[in-house]
From Swiss-Prot:
One GO molecular-function entry: structural constituent of ribosome
GO cellular component: cytosolic large ribosomal subunit
Keyword Ribosomal protein part of the UniProt annotation: yes
GO biological process, one term: translation
Classification via Pfam families: Ribosomal_L19 (PF01245)
Keyword Ribonucleoprotein: yes
Name this protein carries in UniProt: Large ribosomal subunit protein bL19
Regions annotated as coiled coil: none
Family note: Belongs to the bacterial ribosomal protein bL19 family.
PANTHER family in UniProt: LARGE RIBOSOMAL SUBUNIT PROTEIN BL19M, RIBOSOMAL PROTEIN L19
InterPro entries attached to this UniProt entry: Ribosomal_bL19, Ribosomal_bL19_CS, Ribosomal_bL19_sf, Translation_prot_SH3-like_sf
Gene designation per UniProt: rplS
């Protein structure tokens, strides 16, 4: 990569995001601006994929809300994300957990890892 681009992106990369993988349950604290005031909205779910490296890296979190699956994709270096908490580490054998989209109930559970 060009040294100039590396220098510019180095300042934008966040180092306060904890290490997590696909299968981990995380809570993402998102800053939401409504009119003149700002609040924090929590989004808790299972990480079903991580994609990319550097400034363009993203991760997708899936949760079930009122019986409907909801997925949100967040950039790792997004300034709107206040913080990310890792609730539990899951034991999975895949990097992308797209198969969870077809699973319901107990078959959608992920075993806890012994880390």
């Amino acid at each position: 990569m060009d040294p100039l681009i590396q220098e510019l992106t180095k300042e934008q990369i966040r180092d306060d995001i904890p290490a997590f993988r696909a299968g981990d349950t995380v809570t993402v604290h998102v800053r939401v601006v409504e009119g003149t005031h700002e609040r924090i909205q929590l989004f808790e779910g299972v990480v079903i994929k991580k994609k990319g490296t550097g400034i363009g890296a993203t991760y997708t979190v899936r949760k079930i809300a009122s019986g409907v699956g909801v997925e949100r994709t967040f950039p790792v270096n997004d300034p709107r994300v206040a913080k990310v908490e890792v609730k539990r580490h899951g034991r999975v054998r895949r990097a992308k957990l797209y198969y969870l989209r077809e699973r319901h109930g107990k078959s959608a559970r992920i075993a806890e890892a012994r880390r």
